[in-house]
A protein has these predicted regions:
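The feature captures two recurrent sequence modes
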Residues: 1-147, 151, 265-286, 291-338
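A contiguous, surface-oriented mixed alpha/beta subdomain in the mid-to-C-terminal portion of proteins
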Residues: 126-327
Length: 338
């Protein structure tokens, strides 16, 4: 990536490699002059996800936001372009960061100012299906369509006041709640499971595999999409709760041992645990991932799988339910000491 000599050089390096803190974040006027090759990667990423057979399984709010954002499928947008379409609608604004994976404390301090950070890092040709670190395609295509809408701005507004007032243990839970909602959440819409999370939407391989699980649940007669799908999911989850607790404990143990650091390990970890724990692979637990009702206590026990595919996706019956469940944990922390 290159810029004029009067502007900082954004390298995409991780912060610990010595980035000058004064240049860690930019303002909207500091734009990057992307190469033709970088625009071509953006174009191919956009085309790879922007397909009717995939987008029909993505929630309406994302599609509405994508229409509002009016992204050019062939060119990486400028920060100024993004701010013009977002700030007037929800009050949030965009800043670019030279950090590939921003530390949570810095992230939520920016959130408190209603600033959403996008990295200057763009995945390579070898990472088109999956990138272990969030890149600018993930940040822009995955998240920013939602930030044109008040309901999503309200969801994001909940996190910073709680995080900045939380204990270290509570901070870890808050990070997991954000991960399994805005990054990898699923919502019920029109009697179907629909992808909501930006991490899933912006990763072609994970999006396709998640959609395949939606189909498997119907094929194996686990979920009848003519009935109340959320209630069915709750029933199956309760029936297999003991096994699911063992799987979550197993995922946590693998995470602590550093054994979830690759794409293959992340996707296959559930199947490995079924084998090692002697859990039958059938019904709700018959696929490569597990769908579960959104539950704060369950999510608190499941680590983020940053460098791997997610083993579990949590489902909300509606966005209103998601807001209420997040409030049940976040509001008391945010108000503490007030």
């Amino acid at each position: 990536m290159s810029e004029s000599r009067s502007r900082p050089t954004y390298t995409g390096d991780i912060a610990s490699r010595g980035i000058d803190r004064a240049q860690e974040y930019s303002v909207e006027t500091q734009e990057i002059a992307f190469t033709d090759d970088q625009h071509a990667i953006w174009e191919d990423l956009f085309a790879g996800v922007h397909r009717p057979l995939l987008l029909e399984h993505v929630c309406r709010s994302f599609l509405d936001g994508l229409a509002r954002l009016e992204l050019d499928p062939t060119r990486i947008p400028t920060v100024a372009y993004l701010n013009e379409r977002i700030q007037r609608r929800t009050g949030w604004r965009i800043e670019r960061t030279a950090v590939r994976y921003t530390q949570a404390d810095d992230w939520y301090r920016k959130f408190a100012q209603r600033i959403f950070l996008i990295t200057d890092y763009l995945r390579t040709r070898g990472q088109m299906e999956f990138t272990p670190e969030p890149d600018m395609f993930h940040d822009i295509f995955g998240h920013l369509p939602y930030l044109t809408q008040d309901f999503y701005a309200r969801i994001e507004d909940r996190f910073a006041p709680a995080y900045l007032n939380a204990t270290p243990e509570e901070k870890e839970v808050i990070k997991r709640l954000a991960w399994y909602s805005t990054e990898f959440g699923v919502v019920v819409e029109d009697g179907r499971f629909k992808v909501f999370g930006a991490g899933t939407i912006s990763g072609r391989a994970e999006l396709a595999n998640t959609i395949m699980e939606f189909y498997r649940l119907s094929r194996d007669k686990v979920i009848d999409y003519h009935g109340a799908v959320y209630e069915q999911l709750q029933g199956h989850f309760l029936a297999r709760q003991a096994d699911i607790r063992r799987i979550i404990a197993g995922v946590d143990a693998l995470h602590r041992q550093g054994q979830m650091s690759s794409q293959a390990d992340g996707w296959n970890v559930v199947q490995v645990l079924y084998r090692d724990l002697g859990i039958a692979r059938d019904g709700l637990l018959g696929g490569g991932v597990i769908l579960a009702p959104f539950d704060v206590e369950v999510i608190a026990k499941l680590p983020k799988t940053v460098y791997a595919f997610n083993p579990m996706f949590f489902v909300c019956e509606s966005f209103e339910q998601m807001e209420n469940l997040l409030d049940s944990y976040l509001k008391p922390i945010a108000r503490r000491g007030a």
